[in-house]
Amino acid sequence: MISGAHVIIYSNDADADRAFFRDVLQFPAVDAGRGWLIFALPPAELAMHPAEGDASHELFLMCPELKAVLSTLQAHHIRFEGPTEARWGTIVHVDLPSGSRIGLYQPKHPTALSLWPR
């Protein structure tokens, strides 16, 4: 049975992006060795991997209290665009220290998070 997901963000500055998830978003992590942090996500994992050339990904983190998260980003001088309203939620694009981007959104729709058996 599948118990979760492992998300990989390829990064041109993995150390800086790891620090962002650890220090700004305060995601708990385990050290997989040699500084490779694996972050806990409900119910998935998030890892930073170095990239050669163009890095690409699309990751949106769901935030039931988006305004509070934006206040934290502002306090840490993290650049972001938005918020903008979409049919499915309020959307923000966040610039990671490496220059890659992730999205944050506060959903307006029912979520499936509670459907996974625990």
What label would you give each PLM region?
Residues 13-15, 60-102, 106-111:
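Vicinal oxygen chelate
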Residues 1-18, 45, 57-59, 108-118:
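N-terminal beta-strand motif that seeds the catalytic metal site of vicinal oxygen chelate
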Residues 36-37, 88, 114:
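Positions that flank functional sites
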Residues 13-28, 72:
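Amphipathic alpha-helical segments
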